[in-house]
Amino acid sequence: MSFEVFEKLESKVQQALDTITLLQMEIEELKEKNDALNQEVQGARESREALVRENEELKQEQSSWQERLRALLGKMEDVQ
């Protein structure tokens, strides 16, 4: 009878080891996915920052053109 108990215990230990191994593999896969997602987030963050800078530059350029246009309109009014 003790041999049967030993076999059951051995079987349960093996199942536990198999489960642990599978969970470790899953953890590694999730870590890799997490790293890939972190890189994707960093790339998106950098793209966003570049777009914000470009937007600011375009706003400044627009403001400059508006000032030039106002100056030209002012000169046209003076001529009339």
Swiss-Prot record:
GO terms for cellular component: cytoplasm. GO terms for biological process: division septum assembly; FtsZ-dependent cytokinesis. Pfam families: ZapB (PF06005). Residues 3-80 form a coiled coil. Homodimer. The ends of the coiled-coil dimer bind to each other, forming polymers. Interacts with FtsZ. Belongs to the ZapB family. Non-essential, abundant cell division factor that is required for proper Z-ring formation. It is recruited early to the divisome by direct interaction with FtsZ, stimulating Z-ring assembly and thereby promoting cell division earlier in the cell cycle. Its recruitment to the Z-ring requires functional FtsA or ZipA. This is Cell division protein ZapB. The gene is zapB.
